[in-house]
UniProtKB/Swiss-Prot annotation:
It is an enzyme of class 2 (transferase). The keyword Cytoplasm applies. This is tRNA (guanine-N(1)-)-methyltransferase. Gene3D superfamilies: 3.40.1280.10, tRNA(m1g37)methyltransferase, domain 2. It comes from Caldanaerobacter subterraneus subsp. tengcongensis (strain DSM 15242 / JCM 11007 / NBRC 100824 / MB4). Homodimer. Its EC number is 2.1.1.228. GO terms for cellular component: cytosol. It catalyses: guanosine(37) in tRNA + S-adenosyl-L-methionine = N(1)-methylguanosine(37) in tRNA + S-adenosyl-L-homocysteine + H(+). Belongs to the RNA methyltransferase TrmD family. Keywords: Cytoplasm, Methyltransferase, S-adenosyl-L-methionine, Transferase, tRNA processing. It is found in: Cytoplasm. Coiled coil: none annotated. Pfam families: tRNA_m1G_MT.
Length: 241
């Protein structure tokens, strides 16, 4: 998969792409990230990309010319959708990550300052928000999207089942995880996980996943694909279905 990232700070991505799963994805040729410096498209002799807002107000606004030219440069290479990272966008979810992972190539536009000139919306295809809070720029949000999407691409994770069992994969939060030692400061690993009975382990994990979701994110249960056994378990916990 190819990501075209339009940004004023391409160097910010060098670290995240040089470690862990993203690094391995690049090495396996499962991921390619083209870092495109918006400033390179500015026609201003000082390479300015921002100016004061019409009507007054605090801060600066990213100018349309460099953004239009940068986006048109990307779109000239094919039918590539451009998504603007913005707090006004559609909330990024695991479901959205899954849909994006099926695409061959997408572009992410990272805003800065007080945002972009409104006319730039004419050449973008959508907006993505990673939550109801404000960041200095879209770079961190773009990194979140790239990471979440990349781990869903076939062949990226060493154990594909990991992606299926993680939180939000089926609108349920993940079950508790344990590793060695068996006892730490008086706290023991649940006996069922040591039993070797895979059916009982799977049942325990499913019930713990349901229990944790009910406790921390009950809103997700309305979207989850629940079995009759799941529903019975939740009713016993006081959840009305």
């Amino acid at each position: 998969m190819i990501f075209d990232v339009l940004t004023l700070f391409p160097e910010m991505f060098e670290c995240v792409l040089s470690h862990s799963i993203l690094k391995r994805a690049v090495e396996k040729s499962k991921l390619k990230v083209n870092l495109i410096n918006i400033r390179d498209f500015s026609k201003d002799k000082h390479k300015r990309v921002d100016d004061y807002p019409y009507g007054g107000g605090p801060g600066m606004v990213m100018m349309p010319q460099p953004l239009f030219d940068a986006i048109e440069f990307v779109k000239s290479q094919g039918n590539i959708p451009v998504y603007y990272l913005s707090p006004k966008g559609k909330i990024f979810t695991q479901e959205m990550a899954r849909e994006l992972s099926k695409m061959e190539r997408i572009a992410l536009l990272c805003g800065h300052y007080e945002g972009i000139d409104e006319r730039v919306y004419a050449v973008i295809d959508g907006e993505i928000s990673i939550g109801d809070f404000i960041l200095t720029g879209g770079e961190l949000a773009a990194m979140v999207v790239i990471d979440a999407v990349t781990r869903l691409i076939d062949g990226v994770l060493s154990h594909p089942q990991s992606a299926l069992e993680e939180s939000f994969s089926d609108y349920l939060l993940e079950y508790p995880q344990y590793t060695r030692p068996e006892v730490f400061r008086g706290m023991r690993v649940p006996e069922v996980l040591l039993s070797g009975n895979h059916a009982e382990i799977a049942r325990w994990r499913r019930q713990k996943s349901l229990e944790i979701t009910l406790l921390k994110r009950p809103d997700l249960l309305k979207k989850a694909n629940l079995t009759e056994e799941d529903k019975k378990f939740l009713r016993e916990k006081g959840y009305e279905i």
